[in-house]
């Protein structure tokens, strides 16, 4: 019996099939640098600071705090809602009030844990009196939303409600007619 280490065996095998591959037992970095958890966290923190630094914003002036996100930033499912309500403004996380309870039930019904997805909103500050964000407010925050999506880089993007739909496809559509229709959205050159 002749004992050979794995490197010799692999080299012999690759030579036998005329491969140009060179064996190496060095670990393979499977994630791109921009996908490393530390880099993603840093990008999210920088984005959060940019949003917090917005000046001359009525939403910010009437809200208690910025509501940025909740959930697993490594998730391949990203959910985008309208904007924070009173409960979200108090807690600092999206989908914490009645809409959050409904979302939790819907996710449980399809055996998905809330903690396993990533959640954000179109606007990050509560509109006064829980009103719907205006088109101008949606437009103001859209660049931050698109950057947020680009950082998370989900495989599935779920938009919840008319405001989220407007942020992606404009206000010439009615949600009642678009509900249930799959659409491709291009953000920063990538199709979602």
Predicted feature residues:
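A polyanion-binding, active-site-adjacent surface
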Residues: 3, 8-192
């Amino acid at each position: 019996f002749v004992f050979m280490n794995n490197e010799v065996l692999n080299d012999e095998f690759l030579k036998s099939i005329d491969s140009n591959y060179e064996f190496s037992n060095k670990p393979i970095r499977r994630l791109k640098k921009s996908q490393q958890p530390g880099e993603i966290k840093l990008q999210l923190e920088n984005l959060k600071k940019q949003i917090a630094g917005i000046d001359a914003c009525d939403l910010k002036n009437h809200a208690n705090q910025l509501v940025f996100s909740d959930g697993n930033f490594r998730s391949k499912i990203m959910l985008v809602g309208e904007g924070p309500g009173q409960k979200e403004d108090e807690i600092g996380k999206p989908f914490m009030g009645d809409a959050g309870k409904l979302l939790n039930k819907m996710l449980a019904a399809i055996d998905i844990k809330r903690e396993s997805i990533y959640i954000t909103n179109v606007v990050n500050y509560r509109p006064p009196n829980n009103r719907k964000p205006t088109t101008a407010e949606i437009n103001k925050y859209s660049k931050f939303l698109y950057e947020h999506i680009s950082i998370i880089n989900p495989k599935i993007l779920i938009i919840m409600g008319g405001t989220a739909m407007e942020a992606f496809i404009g206000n010439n559509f009615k949600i009642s007619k678009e509900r249930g229709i799959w659409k491709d959205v291009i953000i920063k050159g990538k199709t979602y």
